[in-house]
Design a protein with these regions (language model features):
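Generic structural motif recognizing short loop/turn segments at the entrances and edges of beta-strands
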Residues: 18-21, 41-42, 73-75, 85-88, ...
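Non-catalytic regulatory appendages
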Residues: 66, 89-227
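Structured nucleic-acid-interacting core domains from mobile-element enzymes and related host factors
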Residues: 1-77
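Mid-sequence acidic-hydrophobic segments that form the walls
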Residues: 27, 31, 82, 112-113
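Short, conserved catalytic/metal-binding motifs centered on acidic residues
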Residues: 22-29, 79, 123-128, 168
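Intrinsically disordered, low-complexity regulatory regions enriched in Ser/Pro/Gly/Thr
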Residues: 14-17, 68-73, 81-84, 114-117, ...
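Marks the mature luminal ectodomains of secretory-pathway proteins
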Residues: 48, 81-82, 141
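Fold-level signal for large, globular catalytic cores of enzyme and receptor domains
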Residues: 80, 85-92
Length: 227
C-alpha cells in the first residue's frame, strides 16, 4: 500500500512540500455482516474484528481467552498533504478502537510514512471519547499548552500538532447552544462579558431576519435549523 502511495505521489510530480501533511483518523459505524472474499483461489471470511497483533494479545490477556466477534466499525487512516494530496493508506475492522489501540496504530503509521518519505506534521480527528482519551495519552508527559508533541521517530523535524476536526467541533458547539436556555436544568450557556447567550437569541434573530429585515443576511438557513 505504501509503495502504491509513493508511486501516486511521484506520478503527480508532487513537490517536496506535498510529502508533508497530516493524518486524518475517522471511525465509521458499519452494519455487522459476514462475507466471503476470494483471492487466488482461496476463500476468506471477512467481517470479523481485525486489528493489530498487539490489540489481539491485549484482549486475550484481559479476557483470559481468545474471542472472535463481528466488527461494528471501520477505522480509516488518511494522509492529507499540504498541497492537497490525499491518500487513505490503511483501515481496520474494529468494535470501537480504544485509546491505547489508537496510540499504537498512530505511531506505526507515522513510522511507516517516514520510511517512504512522508512526514506527519498534524493529527486530526473528531471529538469522540476514545479520541479524547488518545489525545490525553499523547499529551500526558509534554506539559504542552499548544497541543503539540515530538515525532519520536524523527525529533529533529517539525512537531506534530493535534487538532480536532472543525466540522465536528462546530456541530458540538451548535448542539450545546441548542440546549441552552433560562431554565434551571439548562447549564450550558455561552457567555460574553458576563452576559449569557441563549438559543432563544439565535432563533429570534433568525425570525427577525426572515420577517422584518428587507435584505435577509442568512439566506442558507431554514426553519429546520431552529425548530
Amino acid at each position: 500500500m505504501f509503495h502504491w502511495m509513493l508511486n501516486e505521489a511521484k506520478n503527480r510530480n508532487l513537490s517536496p512540500e506535498g510529502y508533508e501533511g497530516g493524518l486524518l483518523i475517522d471511525e465509521m459505524t458499519i452494519q455487522q455482516d459476514i462475507q466471503f472474499s476470494k483471492k487466488g483461489g482461496t476463500l476468506k471470511l471477512i467481517g470479523f474484528k481485525d486489528f493489530t497483533e498487539e490489540s489481539k494479545h491485549m484482549n486475550i490477556l484481559m479476557n483470559h481467552k481468545k474471542n472472535v466477534c463481528l466488527a461494528t466499525h471501520v477505522l480509516q487512516f488518511l494522509f492529507l498533504g499540504t498541497t492537497g494530496f490525499r491518500f487513505p493508506f490503511t483501515y481496520f475492522s474494529t468494535t470501537g478502537a480504544s485509546a491505547s489501540e489508537l496510540y499504537l496504530v498512530f505511531w506505526k503509521a507515522v513510522n511507516y510514512l517516514a520510511m517512504f518519505g512522508f512526514s506527519v506534521t498534524f493529527l486530526s480527528m473528531d471529538g469522540e471519547q476514545s479520541n479524547r482519551d488518545f489525545m490525553n495519552i499523547l499529551l500526558a508527559h509534554t506539559g504542552s499548552g499548544t497541543f503539540t508533541i515530538d515525532n519520536i521517530y524523527d525529533p529533529k523535524r517539525s512537531k506534530i500538532s493535534i487538532i480536532m476536526d472543525f466540522s465536528h467541533v462546530m456541530k458540538k458547539i451548535r448542539n450545546n447552544i441548542s440546549k441552552s436556555g433560562k431554565n434551571k436544568y439548562d447549564k450550558r450557556n455561552l457567555t460574553h462579558k458576563e452576559n449569557k447567550i441563549y438559543w432563544e437569541h439565535w432563533r429570534n434573530a433568525y425570525l427577525w431576519d426572515i420577517s422584518t429585515n428587507p435584505f435577509p443576511i442568512h439566506q442558507k438557513l431554514t426553519l429546520e435549523h431552529f425548530f
